[in-house]
């Protein structure tokens, strides 16, 4: 085969017949046969290209499948997202119209009740604090009175001790004087007996 071969498929997906380069320098009869052989190969090459594109080149089929899948996916996704958005809109509308006013009313009612309870608890705590303050004041007064009484008793006790000590000292001094007198008398008597 002089330069002729199977056609290679292009990127476009269709097989184009290749031109047959005929650079043969043949004599006159042969020159007439070569173009006739080239024209005979053209339909074969074309058929081979079509067979290749039908059997081996799946790009058009795959592209069609991809387009169909994308179209179906976008339609289903669009409908699903539309349903989600409608459900969200419905939920928001119900929340704004029904639930939010109920929550506000319930919160207002409960807050009033809680506020009243807090006020009552605050009053009770204030009363308890006043009672506790009064108890502490009474207790402090009792402690001060007890302290003053103890100080007075201590002063009285110290004064009594001082007077008793003075009495004891006085008695001791008198007793010492008596003993001195007694000893001096005894010494005088002894002196009388010694002189004998």
Swiss-Prot record:
The keyword Transmembrane helix does not apply. InterPro entries: Bloc1s5 (IPR017243). It comes from the Eukaryota. Pfam families: Muted. Keywords: Coiled coil. Residues 103-196 form a coiled coil. One of its GO terms (cellular component) is axon cytoplasm. GO terms for biological process: anterograde synaptic vesicle transport; endosome to melanosome transport; melanosome transport; otolith morphogenesis; positive regulation of pigment cell differentiation; vesicle-mediated transport. Component of the biogenesis of lysosome-related organelles complex 1 (BLOC-1). Belongs to the BLOC1S5 family. Component of the BLOC-1 complex, a complex that is required for normal biogenesis of lysosome-related organelles (LRO), such as platelet dense granules and melanosomes. Plays a role in intracellular vesicle trafficking. This is Biogenesis of lysosome-related organelles complex 1 subunit 5. It comes from Gallus gallus.
